[in-house]
């Protein structure tokens, strides 16, 4: 999942997760965590599959089948976060993770990470959830030529670079609009970018 897609997904999930109560944790398979939530008068299942290839994060009415004996990590999560309510999340979208404060004192955080999975922590590192620095968008062409573009500006994900390169050939006007809007309003920019780069659409 591209970081910009995660950014938009996290904004939508925040509306459901904020104020919800954690009912239960399950681990139906390695690297997969199911969080049963009570939100908006309904029980819902938040499913996270962590890993480098094909990570997932979604709400679903269906709950995957679970092993007869709960996994150790699921039991640990139940101990430290079961029964707690979730506050408004901080989103580190560049690294595809979000942290939700748990009710109780002192405040602890439930962290959902597409690479590492689900955990609970007492503190977050400084700058968690801070927006990345965007360079002058007029310099985009020269930035793409640099070998260290990923290290300097991780928000220029491979898929975003490929999409903008495609737009440079097919729709330069839209490409010029995408970058400024992406840095401010992802929900507006993403549909605009992907709808005009047809062959890139399935990968978004």
Regions found by a protein language model. Give the residues of each.
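Extended, highly charged segments
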Residues: 1-204
């Amino acid at each position: 999942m591209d970081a910009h897609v995660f950014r938009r997904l996290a904004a939508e999930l925040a509306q459901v997760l904020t104020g919800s109560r954690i009912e239960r944790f399950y681990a139906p398979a390695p690297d997969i965590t199911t969080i049963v939530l009570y939100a908006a008068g309904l029980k819902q299942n938040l499913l996270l599959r962590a890993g480098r290839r094909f990570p997932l994060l979604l709400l679903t009415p269906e709950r995957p089948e679970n092993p007869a004996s709960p996994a150790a990590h699921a039991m640990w999560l139940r101990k430290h976060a079961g029964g707690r309510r979730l506050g408004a999340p901080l989103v580190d979208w560049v690294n595809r993770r979000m942290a939700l404060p748990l009710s109780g004192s002192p405040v602890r955080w439930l962290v959902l990470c597409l690479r590492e999975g689900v955990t609970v922590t007492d503190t977050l590192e400084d700058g968690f959830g801070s927006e990345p620095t965007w360079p002058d968008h007029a310099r985009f062409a020269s930035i793409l030529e640099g070998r260290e573009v990923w290290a300097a500006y991780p928000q220029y994900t491979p898929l975003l670079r490929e999409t903008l390169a495609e737009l440079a050939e097919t729709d330069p006007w839209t490409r010029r609009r995408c970058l400024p809007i992406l840095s401010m309003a992802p929900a507006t920019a993403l549909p605009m970018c992907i709808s005009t780069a047809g062959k890139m659409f399935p990968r978004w």
